[in-house]
Regions:
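Active-site-adjacent structural elements that line small-molecule/cofactor binding pockets in enzymes
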Residues: 1-200
């Protein structure tokens, strides 16, 4: 069994160097992974790339990075960069966030979240696995090609609880990230839904 930690919040532990120190100490303590939330003032992917340079073994991931903050091309660029620094230890966790945050803080319309994520994942998937994309969707369009000599594999997890997002997690992602979910819900609903979608 692997054991990981989740960090993200206020106070000294929520500062840039405070979070990096937590990851370094977690590796020393023998934890297998550390997951960081994109909240408060810190760009979590930048922080994780800095922490990756100070660690060698612990797996690191976002739980989660909000998709409304970056175009999927920019997200793929940054994820590939972090994975290069982390030497394969990085997992990208994505989520659409919440309507009060997207509309209240960002001033954007929280419109068709499932369609937003479906198109977003298709673009990120193409860029991180093939290095190129030619996509014209209802919300996003993307046409570009990366010049990296090699593309590091990046596991992608999707924050999902509802049936459409869970199906998308099974079809297009490598799994899900849940929030305040009990074991019975995982056993009876979330795991079977994702597994069914993954095997279609």
């Amino acid at each position: 069994m692997k054991i990981g930690l989740f960090i993200g919040g206020a106070g000294s532990a929520g500062t840039l160097h405070g979070q990096i120190s937590q990851i370094v100490e977690a590796e020393k303590a023998g934890f297998d992974s550390l997951w960081a939330a994109h909240i408060m003032d810190i760009d979590v992917m930048t922080m994780l790339s800095m922490a990756a340079e100070q660690t060698t073994r612990i797996e690191i991931g976002t739980a989660v990075t909000p998709t409304f903050l970056r175009h999927p091309i920019a997200m793929a660029q940054q994820a590939l960069t972090v994975q290069k620094v982390a030497n394969g230890r990085f997992t990208l966790g994505l989520g659409v966030n919440h309507k009060p945050v997207v509309e209240g803080r960002l001033g954007m319309k929280f419109h068709r979240p499932w369609r937003h994520m479906f198109e977003y994942l298709n673009i990120v998937h193409s860029l991180t696995r093939e290095g190129k994309v030619d996509y014209e969707g209802e919300i996003f369009s993307a046409n570009t090609q990366f010049t990296m000599s090699s593309l590091p594999e990046i596991p992608v997890l999707l924050a999902a609880l509802g049936p459409r997002m869970l199906n998308t997690a099974g079809e297009l992602a490598d799994g899900t990230i849940t929030w305040m979910t009990g074991t019975e819900t995982l056993r009876r609903y979330i795991v079977p839904t994702i597994n069914d979608a993954a095997h279609r």
